[in-house]
Regions:
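A helix-centric hydrophobic-segment signal that preferentially recognizes long
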Residues: 1-184
């Protein structure tokens, strides 16, 4: 009888260890999948940018510095390797795209162009997908980080070779500036 109790306790402990280990592995895989989705959406956006730049260039030939800023930001965004680098490059690219779209506002013929409108619509859709992917990634990173930091799964994190992950945070300098309000 004692041997059955010992075997049952050992079996329960083994099941507990295995379930904690598998939970951490599943969370880690989910974070990897979420990161892959961000990369897919950022690639899609990067692929749209050359067409958008060429379309705007046809109407606004003297806006070379804006075009150069977009191309440079796109290059950095496509070569970033870490979460922090990707987030920084993404913020820079977003700023450059805002500049490009501001240039487009000055050209009514461009704004009326079917090609430009289609590209702008695709870009807006892609931006929404990027935002959703970022949120999905950060939600999964939060779940993983919580599991890695809390007992009992924190005891198994090292064994499972799972560690905390960085959140995807885009710092947009424009979001920090307080707008000037004048009632004059």
């Amino acid at each position: 009888m004692e041997i059955i109790i010992v075997v049952a306790v050992v079996a329960l402990i083994a099941v507990f260890f295995i379930s904690q280990y598998n939970r951490l592995i599943r969370l880690n895989i989910t974070v990897d999948e979420a990161w892959a989705q961000i990369e897919v959406q950022l690639k899609r956006r990067a692929d749209l940018i050359p067409n958008l730049v060429e379309t705007v260039k046809g109407y606004a030939k003297h806006e070379q510095s804006t075009f150069d800023a977009v191309v440079t930001a796109r290059e950095k965004a496509t070569t970033a390797s870490t979460v922090a680098d990707t987030a920084a490059a993404d913020g820079m690219l977003t700023q450059a795209l805002r500049g490009l779209l501001a240039v487009a506002e000055a050209y009514p013929d461009l704004k009326a162009s079917a090609n430009f409108m289609s590209l702008q619509e695709e870009l807006a859709t892609t931006e929404n997908k990027v935002a959703f992917s970022r949120q999905f990634y950060n939600d999964n990173v939060r779940s993983l980080n919580t599991a890695v930091k809390t007992i009992p799964s924190s005891f198994f994190a090292g064994f499972a070779k799972v560690s905390e992950r960085e959140f995807y945070e885009v710092e947009d300098p424009q979001d920090r500036n307080v707008p000037n309000v004048s009632f004059n």
